[in-house]
């Protein structure tokens, strides 16, 4: 039964169906505005008085309405949760991407620092040199057995590791000087700590010597020990050491390692202890030792030109600071011209026609390229002089290819 009451307070009452029959429930309805004012005409009280049957019927109706509303709201809630989860997933993915990118950048930076730390131009020279020397004792394709390749890889690895030791120990000993001369090097720039660099040098040297000992080859073991001792004496700042500050001792170190150890120790190792043949010193080996020794002496002089500023600052008297950059450059270029002239004469005396032709044309070409490159050197620019030094390393690589045509 519906009863209507007029009341200015607009507080409708309803006999709520979920309560007991005969109870009264007051409902507060919102006021509306009409043209800026309250619409009082709609302010009425509504009271609903429910009987027992009416209460049951209304309750079922309300439940049905609630179920209908719930069904209608389910899709919205589902999509709302999905969108929220997607946003959370996107945020999580973005954080993961940032962390992944940051880790990748740090890893790549460290790997690049390690790459620079090994002085790759010298490492390439070692790979080319040892490979070339390993080929000299071969007499036929039948010598290229699996055992030969395995022994070659072991010897090459020991040489590369020792070469890297010499380059890294030099950087560990020259951190302060390199901050002036070569600020881009890993230790000088701070990309690697000195402790890390020292640990790497120890691992490199010990691993190289361990491989040599495992091969049980006296010439190889002897050569690597000499290489280790000279590399240490060249760089380490101890009494009677640090030979790099003396032009004669510095040149002697490079000549012995590149000109003699490379050639004879590794050649005898491959010829006697890998191929099982008696030791025979060949003409190409002698030629390689002579011309590589000359190029090595030149490189020991050239490398001091871009380092002159730092050497002066720390009180080191290099040959470049004594004679002047221009005189040292001229001396190096003339020494290489002389070596290539001798190489052309030796090649012309070869009985192997193809070897004669390749040797003459090859060394003449290298001499011509050297002359062209020397014209472009700017002695006032350290980057230019260092670039020329790296160019001489390329001549070093090229010579190891040409020695095989001298038969």
From Swiss-Prot:
rRNA-binding listed as a keyword: no
Family to which this protein belongs: Belongs to the UbiA prenyltransferase family.
Subcellular location: Plastid, Chloroplast membrane
Keywords for this protein: Chloroplast, Membrane, Plastid, Transferase, Transit peptide, Transmembrane, Transmembrane helix
Tissue and organ distribution: Expressed in leaves. Detected in the flavedo of lemon peels, but not in albedo.
Classification of source organism: Eukaryota, Viridiplantae, Streptophyta, Embryophyta, Tracheophyta
GO cellular component, one term: chloroplast membrane
Root EC class: transferase
The encoding gene: ClPT1
Signal peptide: none
Main location: plastid
Function, in words: Prenyltransferase specific for geranyl diphosphate as prenyl donor and coumarin as prenyl acceptor. Can use umbelliferone and esculetin as substrates, and with a lower activity, 5,7-dihydroxy-coumarin and 5-methoxy-7-hydroxycoumarin. No activity with 5-hydroxy-7-methoxycoumarin, bergaptol, xanthotoxol, p-coumaric acid, caffeic acid, 2,4-dihydroxycinnamic acid, kaempferol, genistein or homogentisate. No activity with dimethylallyl diphosphate, farnesyl diphosphate or geranylgeranyl diphosphate as prenyl donors.
EC number: 2.5.1.138
Gene3D superfamilies named in the record: UbiA prenyltransferase
Pfam families for the chain: UbiA
Biological source species: Citrus limon (Lemon)
Catalytic activity: umbelliferone + (2E)-geranyl diphosphate = 8-geranylumbelliferone + diphosphate; esculetin + (2E)-geranyl diphosphate = 8-geranylesculetin + diphosphate
InterPro entries, A to Z: UbiA_prenyltransferase, UbiA_sf
GO molecular function: prenyltransferase activity
Transmembrane segments: 121-141, 184-204, 209-229, 248-268, 279-299, 328-348, 352-372, 386-406
Cofactor requirements of the protein: Mg(2+)
Transit peptide, from-to: 1-81
Recorded topology in the membrane: Multi-pass membrane protein
Domain of life: Eukaryota
Protein name, UniProt field: Coumarin 8-geranyltransferase 1, chloroplastic
């Amino acid at each position: 039964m519906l009863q209507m009451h007029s009341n200015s307070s607009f507080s409708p009452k309803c006999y709520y169906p979920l309560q007991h029959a005969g109870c009264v429930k007051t409902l507060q309805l919102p006021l509306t505005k009409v043209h800026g004012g309250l619409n009082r005409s709609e302010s009425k009280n509504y009271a609903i008085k429910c009987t027992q049957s009416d209460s049951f019927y209304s309750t079922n109706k309300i439940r049905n309405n609630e179920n209908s509303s719930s069904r209608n709201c389910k899709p919205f809630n589902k999509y709302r949760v999905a969108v929220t989860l997607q946003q959370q997933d996107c945020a999580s993915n973005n954080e993961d991407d940032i962390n992944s990118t940051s880790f990748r950048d740090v890893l790549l930076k460290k790997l690049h620092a390690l790459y620079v730390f090994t002085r790759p131009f010298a490492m390439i020279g070692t790979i080319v040199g040892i490979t070339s020397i390993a080929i000299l004792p071969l007499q036929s394709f039948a010598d290229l057995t699996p055992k030969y390749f395995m022994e070659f890889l072991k010897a090459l690895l020991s040489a590369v590791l020792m070469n890297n030791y010499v380059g890294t120990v030099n950087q560990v000993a020259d951190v302060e000087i390199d901050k002036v001369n070569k600020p881009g090097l890993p230790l000088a720039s701070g990309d690697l700590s000195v402790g890390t660099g020292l640990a790497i040098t120890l691992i490199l040297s010990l691993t190289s010597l361990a491989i040599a000992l495992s091969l049980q080859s006296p010439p190889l073991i002897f050569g690597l020990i000499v290489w280790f001792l000279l590399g240490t004496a060249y760089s380490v700042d101890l009494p009677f050491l640090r030979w790099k500050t003396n032009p004669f001792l510095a040149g002697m170190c490079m000549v012995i390692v590149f000109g003699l150890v490379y050639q004879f120790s590794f050649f005898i190792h491959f010829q006697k202890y890998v191929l099982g043949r008696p030791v025979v010193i060949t003409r190409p080996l002698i030629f390689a030792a002579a011309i590589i020794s000359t190029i090595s002496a030149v490189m020991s002089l050239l490398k001091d030109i871009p380092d002159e500023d730092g050497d002066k600052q720390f009180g080191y008297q290099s040959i470049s600071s004594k004679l002047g950059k221009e005189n040292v450059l001229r001396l190096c270029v003339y020494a290489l011209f002389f070596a290539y002239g001798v190489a052309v004469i030796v090649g012309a005396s070869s009985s192997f026609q193809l070897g004669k032709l390749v040797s003459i044309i090859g060394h003449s070409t290298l001499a011509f390229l050297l002359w062209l490159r020397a014209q472009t050197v700017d002695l006032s620019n350290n980057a230019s002089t260092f670039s020329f030094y790296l160019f001489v390393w390329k001549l070093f690589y090229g010579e190891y290819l040409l020695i095989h045509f001298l038969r």
